[in-house]
A protein has these predicted regions:
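Catalytic cores of nucleotide-sugar-dependent glycosyltransferases that transfer UDP/GDP/TDP-activated
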Residues: 1-477
Length: 477
């Protein structure tokens, strides 16, 4: 099967969020199963600066974008069994950031149009074009539109994956013809119209042959208003083609036995190195060097939907326990200020790093005993899987992928691999945090079992890739 994976970011080329991790791993896992896989993304400034010398020039052409004819270059790179293509246009992509510009609609409209037209330039016609989020949501629409008058596009199946439905690509109705070059019937007929605006993600959900969400629970949550940001009816009406596929993590990249950023390596069979990593983390962050005190950690964006209001409300309560608390992240000023003041109050028992450091993040995963993710919503979440891989027992709210990957510890039968709470309230969260701290102190054997279950769990992309392969086969029949 020939598969083209369309994304706006991918590790190791460029990253702003979890989409990049998925896009950097899933194509490789699909290729390992024997499929012919290629992936395509914009040639951003940071990609050209770092990878430019390794890129092979394929061709240049002009792309039709409404009334404009726009230059488009195509470059390629072979990596890990996947052919990576890069769409070049310096007007749109020679910028310091990936997103956040006034003309993002035009930028990714061009990208989607370029992908659609460049399908004819690929060595083999793809059977499936797999798109991600609003930035490539126009591709299924363009393919459906072109298939009416060009036989080449007939038979190409499309998939759209929703990583975070909050971001939908909404623009004024005048963009239909003037910016995206579509007949206004796409808007008037309701395919891309929502609330009087153009909604690109809605259009892809309606048009694509299959819709996937990044975890089974998130796929179900998207049918409800609390999670769907207005698109709950659209998701419910398209439920027959909606699938929840849990993301994986790169098990080789996230491996404490070979992670060079750690003070000491360790494995599920030999945890001596983790004790050294804990001591090293305490020294680096200025914490009291106490091996028997558990470290509770968060590596997160400091924004409300990550559950920070619950943490602020209960901090004094759970810090009344024998525990150390570490926070790595940046975000809203009110949370940054709160944690800065809290760090001063708790001295050597609390550390806060406002910003992001990949190396420090890995050192925190390795040094932590408990890992907190009290999110209001979490489509999938990768941090809880990385934490478990590094031997930090997770404490999570039961939502999205957190519910699918972390199962509550049951004292009466010893089942589970972490601690969970269902209701979004401070009391429930504080209760399970205290329960986890008490288990660490009072029942080392039970804690060690939870730790081992997390470290030995299979969070690889192999299973996820096979699920996607099954979806591709079902829509190509």
């Amino acid at each position: 099967m020939n598969i083209l994976y369309v994304t706006s970011e991918a590790v190791p080329f460029c990253k702003t969020g979890g989409l990049a991790d998925v896009a950097g791993s899933l194509p490789q896992a699909l290729a390992a199963n024997g499929d012919r896989v290629s992936a395509i993304l914009p040639l951003y400034e940071r990609v050209k600066d770092k990878w430019g010398e390794q890129l092979h020039f394929e061709k240049w052409t002009f792309v039709r974008l409404a009334w404009r004819s726009v230059y488009c270059g195509l470059f390629s790179l072979e990596r890990d069994g996947v052919t990576w293509y890069f769409v070049d246009n310096e007007t749109y992509f020679r910028r310091s950031e990936l997103y956040g510009y006034y003309d993002d609609g035009e930028r990714f409209g061009f990208f989607s149009r370029a992908v659609t037209e460049l399908l004819k330039s690929l060595p083999q016609k793809p059977d499936v074009v797999h798109c991600n989020d609003w930035q490539s949501a126009l591709v299924p629409i363009y393919i459906r539109d072109e298939a009416v008058r060009d036989d080449f596009y007939k038979g190409i199946r499309t998939v759209i994956t929703v990583h975070n439905i909050e971001y939908q690509g909404r623009y004024g109705s005048r963009t239909v013809e003037d910016l995206f070059g579509l007949d206004h019937g796409w808007f008037d007929g309701g395919t891309i119209e929502f609330g009087g605006d153009v909604n690109l993600l809605k259009g892809a959900i309606v048009t694509a042959d299959a819709v996937t969400a990044v975890s089974p629970t998130y796929a179900q949550e998207l049918k409800y208003a609390y999670f769907a940001h207005g698109l709950e009816n659209v998701m419910s009406m398209n439920a027959r083609k909606l699938h929840g596929v849990l993301n994986g993590i790169d098990m080789q990249r996230y491996d404490p036995s070979r992670d060079k950023s750690l003070a000491a390596a360790y494995s599920p069979d030999d945890l001596a190195g983790k004790k050294k990593d804990k001591a090293a983390l305490q020294r680096v962050l200025g914490l009291q060097e106490r091996p028997d005190t558990p470290i509770l950690a968060m590596v997160t964006r400091l924004v409300s939907h990550k559950g920070l209001d619950l943490v602020c409300e209960t901090l004094d309560a759970f810090m009344g326990k024998d525990v150390q608390f570490v926070v790595l992240g940046k975000g809203d000023a009110k949370y940054e200020t709160f944690f800065e003041y809290a760090k001063q109050r708790y001295g050597g028992r609390m550390a806060v790093y406002l910003g992001y450091s990949e190396q420090l993040a890995m050192q925190i995963y390795a040094g932590a005993d408990l890992f907190l993710m009290p999110s209001k919503s979490e489509p999938c979440g990768l941090s809880q899987m990385i934490a478990m891989r590094y031997g930090a027992v997770p404490i999570v709210r039961e939502t999205g992928g957190l519910k699918d990957t972390v199962h509550a510890y049951e004292a009466w039968n010893g089942q589970g691999n972490g601690f969970t709470f269902a209701n979004y309230n401070a009391g429930d969260m504080c209760h399970v945090i205290c329960e986890a701290i008490d288990l660490y102190h009072d029942n080392k054997g039970a804690y060690a079992v939870l730790q081992q279950r997390g470290m030995t769990a299979d969070f690889s992309w192999t299973r996820s890739a096979q699920e996607y392969r099954n979806i591709y086969e079902s829509i190509c029949r």
